[in-house]
Curated annotation (Swiss-Prot):
GTPase that plays an essential role in the late steps of ribosome biogenesis. Associates with the 50S ribosomal subunit. Residues 3-167, 204-379 form the EngA-type G domain. GTP 2 binds at residues 210-217, 257-261, 322-325. This is GTPase Der. GO terms for molecular function: GTP binding. GTP 1 binds at residues 9-16, 56-60, 119-122. PANTHER family: GTPASE DER. InterPro entries: G_ENGA, GTP-bd, GTPase_Der, KH_dom-like, KH_dom-like_a/b, P-loop_NTPase, Small_GTP-bd. Keywords: GTP-binding, Nucleotide-binding, Repeat, Ribosome biogenesis. Signal peptide: none annotated. The keyword Nucleotide-binding applies. Residues 380-464 form the KH-like domain.
C-alpha cells in the first residue's frame, strides 16, 4: 500500500460508515449510539483508482487520561501520528461543536496533511454546517454522504491533492511480478492420499474469544509488545472484532480480538447483539480459536457454551487459563482444571489447556506453541490405507453391535476433508449404527492418530449391494 489514512472526528459523525464505504465491506460496527468504535481498526481501502491503507478510530472527546474515553483518545492520537494523512470528519447536519474546534487545533499542531470531510451533506439543513466548517482553518471541506456514497470522487481528488500524485500513484514492480505464474507439474504415480506436509509458512488466523473481562485484549497486547488494544477494569470494553498482525518465529499471525460473550439472556441491547454477531464472524473466519478463561473463576456455564460453539463451528480450539498470577495454589488449581476439562468437555478430549498471565507474560510461549500444534492437527490428513488398517483393528477389538439379530459391518473408510478432519465410512445400514459406537470410533481416531482438541466428524454411507440391480431386473 502506498500510504496510510486515519479517519478521525468526534463520536457519531459517521467515521465507521465512511470506513465501511471505503473498504467495500461492513467491517466496522455502525450504530446510532455514540462511541461504538473504541480500538483502531485497519483495512484496505479502494476509492476510484486509489488504493491505500485506512484506519478507523474512536470518536475523539475531551477526557482525562485515566478514563476509558481518555485511553480511547490516546489510541486515536497514535493512529494520527502513524498515518500519512487524516480525514477529519464533521457532521454537516448537526454543525460544529467546541470538540470539533479543539480537534482541528490538535490536527493543525501536528503539521500533517488533513482533508476536512463534511459528512451527512445530503440531509436537509446541512448547508449551514458545511459553511461553518470553513472556519476550522483546514481548507475547503469536501461534502459527502458516507451512507449513500455521494461525493466519493471529490473525496478522491482531495486526497490526491493533499498527499501528492507521486505518493498516491507509486510505480509498483510487484504488479509485473505477480503475472508470472509457475505451474507445478503433476508427477505420475504420486500418492495424494499420504499425509501431507504441514505448511508452517502460511499466515495463521487466530481468534481470541471468551467472557467479558477475561483478559483477551491484554493477552494480545502482550503478544504484540505494545498497548495496541484498549484494556481496563471495565467489562465489555471491546465491542467489535479487531484484527492485528505480528510475527512469531518467522510466521505471520493474524489475531482477532473480539467482544466478550455473555449469556444470551443477558444480551439485551442492540449494540451488544451486533458485537456478539461480529464475534461469531471472527470465529468462522479463524482457523484456530483461543478461548480465554479467568482462572480465578473458571468453568462458568458460559465458558462451556463458548467452547461448544467453537467446536460446532469446526474450529481448532485451545484453552487459555488467564490471570494465573492471581491463583494462590497453582498446583492444586491446575489439577482441578485438568479434571474439569476432561469431565465437562468430553467432545474435546485432549484439548490443550495452558495456564498463562497476560499481565506478566507468563505462559505465552507455551500458549503460542499450543496454537501451532493444534492447527497442525486441524490440518491433518491420513492415508486411506492407514485408515482401513485401523478400521479393521478397532472392529476386531470391539465389533459393531448386532441390530435385530444382524451384525453391522463397517467396510471401508477414507478421509474426505481436513480443517477439521472429516471421514466417510461405508457400512451396512448406516442409520442403525448407535451414537455410542460413533463416539468409540471418534475417540479411537483421536487417540491412535494423535488428534487432540479438534472436532472430528464421521459420516456414514450405505455400502452398495452388488445384488440390488439383479433383484430389480427380476
Amino acid at each position: 500500500m502506498s500510504f496510510t489514512v486515519a479517519i478521525v472526528g468526534r463520536p457519531n459523525v459517521g467515521k465507521s460508515t465512511l470506513f465501511n464505504r471505503l473498504v467495500g465491506k461492513k467491517l466496522a460496527l455502525v450504530d446510532d449510539t455514540p462511541g461504538v468504535t473504541r480500538d483502531r481498526r485497519p483495512g484496505e481501502a479502494k476509492l476510484v483508482d486509489l488504493r491505500f491503507h485506512i484506519v478507523d478510530t474512536a470518536g475523539l472527546e475531551e477526557a482525562g487520561a485515566d478514563t476509558l474515553e481518555g485511553r480511547m483518545r490516546a489510541q486515536t492520537e497514535i493512529a494520527i501520528d502513524e498515518a500519512d494523512l487524516s480525514l477529519f470528519v464533521v457532521d454537516a447536519k448537526m454543525g460544529l461543536t467546541h470538540v470539533d474546534k479543539a480537534l482541528a487545533d490538535m490536527l493543525r499542531k501536528r503539521g500533517k496533511p488533513v482533508v476536512l470531510v463534511a459528512n451527512k451533506s445530503e440531509a436537509r439543513g446541512s448547508d449551514g454546517g458545511f459553511y461553518d466548517a470553513f472556519t476550522l482553518g483546514l481548507g475547503e471541506p469536501v461534502p459527502i454522504s458516507a451512507e449513500h456514497g455521494q461525493g466519493m470522487i471529490d473525496l478522491r481528488d482531495a486526497i490526491v491533492e493533499a498527499i501528492g500524485v507521486d505518493r498516491a500513484f507509486p510505480e509498483d514492480d510487484d504488479d509485473v511480478a505477480e503475472t508470472d505464474i509457475v505451474l507445478r507439474p503433476t508427477v505420475e504415480g504420486e500418492d495424494d492420499e499420504e499425509d501431507l506436509a504441514y505448511d508452517d509458512t502460511k499466515p495463521l488466523r487466530v481468534a481470541i474469544v471468551g467472557r467479558p473481562n477475561a483478559g483477551k485484549s491484554t493477552l494480545i497486547n502482550r503478544f504484540l509488545g505494545e498497548d495496541r488494544l484498549l484494556t481496563g477494569p471495565e467489562a465489555g470494553i471491546t465491542r467489535d472484532s479487531i484484527s492485528v498482525e505480528w510475527d512469531w518465529r518467522g510466521r505471520t499471525i493474524k489475531m482477532f480480538d473480539t467482544a466478550g460473550m455473555r449469556r444470551k439472556a443477558r444480551v439485551i441491547e442492540k449494540l451488544e447483539k451486533l458485537s456478539v454477531a461480529d464475534t461469531l464472524r471472527a470465529i468462522r473466519f479463524a482457523e484456530t480459536v483461543v478461548i480465554v478463561f479467568d482462572a480465578t473463576i473458571p468453568f462458568e456455564k458460559q465458558d462451556i457454551q463458548i467452547v461448544d460453539l467453537v467446536l460446532r463451528e469446526g474450529r481448532a480450539a485451545v484453552l487459555a487459563f488467564n490471570k494465573w498470577d492471581l491463583v494462590e495454589d497453582p498446583q492444586a488449581v491446575l489439577a482441578e482444571l485438568r479434571e474439569k476439562t476432561e469431565r465437562l468437555l468430553p467432545q474435546a478430549r485432549g484439548i490443550r489447556a495452558v495456564p498463562m498471565a497476560g499481565q506478566t507474560g507468563y505462559g505465552l510461549e507455551k500458549l503460542m506453541q499450543s496454537i501451532i500444534d493444534t492447527d497442525m492437527v486441524w490440518n491433518k490428513r491420513i492415508s486411506t490405507a492407514k485408515l482401513n488398517r485401523w478400521l479393521d483393528s478397532v472392529q476386531t477389538q470391539h465389533p459393531p453391535p448386532a441390530v435385530s439379530g444382524r451384525r453391522l459391518k463397517l467396510k471401508y473408510m477414507t478421509q474426505v476433508k481436513a480443517r477439521p478432519p472429516a471421514f466417510m465410512i461405508s457400512c451396512t445400514r448406516p442409520d442403525s449404527v448407535p451414537e455410542s459406537y460413533i463416539r468409540y470410533l471418534t475417540n479411537g481416531l483421536r487417540a491412535d492418530f494423535n488428534m487432540p482438541g479438534v472436532p472430528i466428524r464421521i459420516h456414514l454411507k450405505a455400502s452398495e449391494n452388488p445384488f440390488e440391480n439383479k433383484r430389480k431386473r427380476r
